Amino acid sequence: DNQRPITCLNTMYKWYTSCLLVPTDKHLDDYDLMEGAQRGARAGCSGTMDNLLIDRMVTLDCHRKKRNLSMGWVDVKKAYDSIDHGWLEEMMIIHRFPTWLCRTTKYLSRSWSTRIVVTTRNGREASEIIKFRKGLPQGDALCPRLFTVCLNPIAWKISASEGYRLSKPIGTTITDLLYIDDLKIFAASESKLSSVMNSVRAAMEDVGLIWNPKKCAVAHFKRGVRVPESTGLLMSDGNVKIPTLEDGQQYKFLGVLETLRQEEKIVLRCAAREYLRRLSVIWSSPLSDYHRVIASNQFALPAMSYFMWTQHWPITELRQVDRDARKIVTEGGGKHPCGTTSLLYLPRDKGGRGLRSVETEYKETKVKAAVKLYQNRDPAMKMVREFEEQAESKGYQSMTKEAGKYAEEYGLQLQLKHPDPVCVTEEGEVVPGDKLKTRLRKLRESRMEGVVEEQKWQGKLITARKEDGDLNTEQCFWWL
């Protein structure tokens, strides 16, 4: 049951399906056929970030306004491997794709096959060709889009439900969050949630998708407080029961642990533990110092940076994570115990080590997240903008408030106006949103250089090298 074979697709097939993806997306965009709640496999859309922001908005609205809310999380067994090919062909016709594209997809689905090759002492032995009678291969560009097309009618059905209506003055209804096959359903009561989940389960079985009850869950809240006597959700056929989240139990949705609200403290603790674990592996390895830093920035740091876009963490705890990280680097020989901390985060071409700070990464991510929120043209994100502005005006924790505070530390003033937010420097220069990342990096490096220049030991040495006319600064640091 736990086997999930992945077939290695050849390069020409991947290139061919990438070419087919262009007219497929164009047809869906031109006729607005994709349900808006489906934010997976969509070009130019940060699906997980958008869904988590909407999820945070709904749960905070329930908590702050003492509202009734029922939520259901749905997990599907081997979703990609279960799509019926007949349903795929029917969906291509229902969505009125061009005839040539329907025929091509039909031909591809009927030609999907593989073979198992085993290397033994007697040589290589190959099995007969194994035909795929159902399911979509993983690894090409087209199949994720075909999968979302197959789920489109289910998304339409959920969007027709009553859902959960946000408090005034927003007052918009949220029915569900969908990212590929990760589904979360909202309802105003337990009975309404039961009705929606029964209809969704029946519709998914028509597609060939089977729920995994052990990984599904429901939670009910009245006046913002969890209902303790809830015993779970019994499906209409009486054979499947969806368990209720118990006290102290969380559900992981799109990588974030949550109950009524997203558990930001637990997420930070788990992310920091994984980040430090990866750092320990990297700095105890035989890699060179340069590659250790690259691995730390590109392998270890993403364990935390993924959550920074949507979570709100205390700066004091992030500074503690940085201290623990520097301790690991020092024990691994990447920093002298008496060495200056600033040089550790200064770029290598300027005499530093090039490591990225968790605190700095968090602050810059918050500024970029606020700008990205106001650049987003998704109609659903308008609600998030209004919610964040309303939270800021009432003194609640807000992304826009945090972003403005952190931008001021870089000498920038945020002007968040949809759809073209900008930053204004102290000199009055206007920085558009698409150039903000580069400007933040330059300001960070400039500020770090200023800190290093004030140091009386290593900083003085670095500054002397830069000011010495007989030395080439670039050649001095190229070996780093």
PLM regions: where:
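Conserved pre-catalytic core of RNA-dependent polymerases
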Residues: 1-153
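Inter-domain linker/hinge segments that demarcate the starts of reverse transcriptase
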Residues: 22-27, 51-63, 192-208, 272-277
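Short, conserved secondary-structure transition motifs
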Residues: 45-48, 110-116, 216-230, 346-351
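Catalytic palm subdomain of template-directed nucleic-acid polymerases
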Residues: 78-95, 136, 176-205, 222-225, ...
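Short amphipathic alpha-helical coiled-coil/interface segments
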Residues: 200, 318-330, 403
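Short, conserved micro-motifs composed of acidic
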Residues: 210-249
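Basic, alpha-helical interaction scaffolds
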Residues: 237-315, 333, 367-383
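Extended C-terminal regions of large enzymes
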Residues: 321, 336-480
